[in-house]
Amino acid sequence: MTSGSQGAFEAARRIVFKVGSALLVDAETGAANRAWLEAFCADAADLRAAGKQVLVVSSGAVALGRRRLGLTGRKTTLPEKQAAAAAGQSLLMRAWEEAFEPHGIGVAQILLTRDDTEMRRRWLNARATTETLMGLGVVPVVNENDTVVTEEIRYGDNDRLAARVAQMAGADLLVLLSDIDGLYTADPRKNPKAQHIPRVSEITPEIAGMAEGANAAAGVGTGGMATKIAAARIARAAGCATLITLGSRPRPLAAIAAGEKATLIEAGASPAAAYKAWIAGSLAPQGWVTVDAGAASALLAGKSLLPAGVRAVEGPFDKGDAVRVRDENGREVARGLVRYDSADAQRIAGLRSDAIEAELGFTEGPMIHADDLAVAH
């Protein structure tokens, strides 16, 4: 019989895997755990061969950099931690490159701060880069930019970063590889009566309380069960399910596919539906775009908004802002994230798509892409 976790894993087409320092870095030597990385990448290659897309959110740069700079065995200051991150990033990426290379898979590093997933313009740019990399068959390896991040703009832990990446990438599954095989009613290492919870349909206060009670103290990283539930809450709101499972198994991803013990936290909706609901209901529109009847019909049919169908632009708004789209009778037909600021949108209104670059010197494609449009009902 297929478990809920196993079924979700099989059905997922785009998966974000969060790998913590405790898995990636050997606690005794402070070096990359090559054997574990090779096993993970072999499993990831099998997933890609099955038609799935894989993204990795990887800790480890600071831990690897501490060893390189001789900062182990004591508490580090913030500047020392940032220096360790700078020294460790190349070591981290080299480890991932070497582990994926035998499978003919390339990797690319993406460094983010919280602003990159919360400021819409930067969010759109990060999403476009991620999509391009995956389209080229490359595995994005994402980490927080610890070299420049400050307390005000840091995620705090890579569980929440992974959830934001899953949201940004439109993933349908987030896998948090942990030091425990899922959520329990209490910490099973302290309470022999603790019961495993295989499936969570809603994150209730009771579930959050269990996570607090079962919070694991990590030896190398910063995340515990409470942060994983917080991450799952973010992912769930974005239409992405979350799997919490034991990452230290010899073939961690194959173990999920085989139905080994894990906790599945179900998604609230599909990623696309959740994203469009966010556009429609959570963002304050910054301007108006008036379109002709043909463009209005195309939008209602699920098409992108091309500049040729735009009759008027009212701003000001920036690239990435939400705008209202109305027909020539003043009826709102959609809301969406615009790919041009209001000044550029006014310049290309009414132009054919192949004339945009000649007018602006660049092109971002349609004025609003269909993926970034929520049609009014």
Swiss-Prot record:
Residues 286-363 form the PUA domain. It comes from the Bacteria. InterPro entries: AceGlu_kinase-like_sf (IPR036393), Asp/Glu/Uridylate_kinase (IPR001048), G5K_ProB (IPR041739), Glu/AcGlu_kinase (IPR001057), Glu_5kinase (IPR011529), Glu_5kinase/COase_Synthase (IPR005715), Glutamate_5-kinase_CS (IPR019797), PUA (IPR002478). Its EC number is 2.7.2.11. Keywords: Amino-acid biosynthesis, ATP-binding, Cytoplasm, Kinase, Nucleotide-binding, Proline biosynthesis, Transferase. Pfam families: AA_kinase, PUA. The keyword Cytoplasm applies. PROSITE patterns: GLUTAMATE_5_KINASE (PS00902), PUA (PS50890). GO terms for biological process: L-proline biosynthetic process. This is Glutamate 5-kinase. It comes from Caulobacter vibrioides (strain NA1000 / CB15N). The lineage of its organism: Bacteria, Pseudomonadati, Pseudomonadota, Alphaproteobacteria, Caulobacterales. The gene is proB.
